[in-house]
Amino acid sequence: MQYKTFLVIFMAYLLVTHEAEAIWSFLIKAATKLLPSLFGGGKKDSSKRKRDVEDFFDPYQRDLDLELERLLSQLQ
């Protein structure tokens, strides 16, 4: 009975504190590693999405780099 009371108090503490984010993210990350079939296709999809995002923002980053270099050269 004391174990259940402690568990309820601990879970309530995690719900109301900001420090709980790290614990919840760890638990979710561990669950996704243990049960990948429940949480999606796995790393292939995430690597494709990451590559798509990098390709999407890459031209803008190049333009920004060129613009920053131009402004820095004007300051010198």
UniProtKB/Swiss-Prot annotation:
Expressed by the venom gland. The keyword Nuclease does not apply. Residues 47-76 form a propeptide. The keyword Protease does not apply. It is found in: Secreted; Target cell membrane. Its main location: secreted. Coiled coil: none annotated. Keywords: Amidation, Antibiotic, Antimicrobial, Cytolysis, Fungicide, Membrane, Secreted, Signal, Target cell membrane, Target membrane. Residues 1-22 form the signal peptide. Belongs to the non-disulfide-bridged peptide (NDBP) superfamily. Medium-length antimicrobial peptide (group 3) family. Peptide that shows antimicrobial activity, moderate cytolysis on eukaryote cells and interference with DNA synthesis. Has potent activity against Gram-positive bacteria and moderate activity against Gram-negative bacteria, as well as moderate activity against fungi. Acts by inducing bacterial membrane disruption. Uses multiple modes of action depending on the membrane lipid composition. Uses a toroidal pore mechanism against the prokaryotic like membrane and forms hexagonal phase non-lamellar structures in eukaryotic-like membrane. Amphipathic and cationic peptide with an alpha-helical structure in membrane-mimicking environment. This is Antimicrobial peptide Smp24.
